[in-house]
Amino acid sequence: MIVAVLVVLVTLGSVAFHMWSPWWWSEIASNWVGMDDTIILTFWITGAVFVAIGLFMAYCIWQYKYNKDKRADYEPENSKLEWALTIITTIGVIALLAPGLIVWNNFVTVPKGAYEIEVVGQQWYWMYRLPGKDGVLGTTDIKNINDDNPFGLNTDDPHSLDDVLIDADDLHILKDQPLKLNLRALDVLHDFYVPQFRAKMD
């Protein structure tokens, strides 16, 4: 009985903490509201499943607690239950995936006239490369990377000669300017995250 009560308290307490948590997202850019809507939809669907499973576990713990006069039934197959769970799971997966795929498609589709920026990660630091006056990012080669050339620029490429190199973590961008960010790293896997865009890429 105590275990069942604890399961109920943990389940409902987790939901309450999420609903009234002091930590929440930062303000999102106005053109990415659909991303937050998708995340909230995911919370509702997975939250409902979480509560249902938690309460069902508590019910089973209470209802089927040990009793020497009761014996468990052996039922290796139940086709009705299997079909019901398969259909419900399929509907849930579609409900989760469909909105996310739409938002993801909008996120990765580069609009015309997007300003191209290269983002380079290294432990524990970010660098940025912007096109110069010619408006074109020059080519790079990992073989060219050294202390004097951390971006690995190809000095034989005329487009590389006027690229703007920013050796700092912060990058300020123009308002209402579409961007295309090209990510690469000098060493290990990095996690690039812009909270205001909900943009997160490893």
Where are these regions (language model features)?
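Non-transmembrane, membrane-proximal soluble domains of secreted or membrane proteins
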Residues: A16-I39, I61-D202
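Transmembrane alpha-helical segments in integral membrane proteins
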Residues: F50-Y66
